[in-house]
């Protein structure tokens, strides 16, 4: 099945690009687009549902609700599946790998009614790879209210960690040197350098200073996103709170070294 990548703007997936394609299925992560960190607003979600509704039964949306649990500063938006309803064109996917642990290996799918019969016909003999004990344990964890309380504790902890990293970056960099984005959802943020050195110099400096980070341009599959240059993708999910200040200082040294190296070439 041929797949095509579409551009992302400040509101998420470009509907102009999608409408200009011959796609029958659109795979999207509206809650938190990786790696840009963009959350699709309600208006764009309604437009996406309208795109599918223009060809009923022939267009579908696969909604991967990636990172929807980790929204810190604003109220959560309704999912596409929730907006469309059970008879809508949305296949909803989610997992417990981020909110609990990857080792649980439990994910789930919510199908629209019009696809349920086809699924039961084609996959009626399919057996899941996760044992019933794990599934029933998770079900009890959810229905008992423990999962909700667990998520609340996680959000509090990750928000504090994000705040510590943001404070460290703003201490190490002058306002005119760095712009931060993608702060409100998920477990990573974007740090865009002003007048940045080449990305190749940043990669070399990251190796030199032992910093594990990626660049936004690493995810550009079209080779045309020039605005991605000089933008670091910084994950903080496993960063100890006590190390945030040192992380900001090391990142500053990394960027200085990259700029000096590029100036000498």
Language-model segments: what does each one mean?
Residues 86-156:
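Conserved core segment of the aminotransferase class I/II
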Residues 86, 199-203, 213-241:
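Active-site-adjacent capping/gating segments
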Residues 10-72, 262:
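Active-site phosphate-binding strand-loop segment of PLP-dependent enzymes
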Residues 208, 224-265:
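PLP-dependent enzyme catalytic core of the Aspartate aminotransferase-like
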Residues 139, 155-166, 178-192, 204-205:
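Conserved glycine-rich beta-strand-loop-beta hairpin in the small C-terminal domain of fold type I
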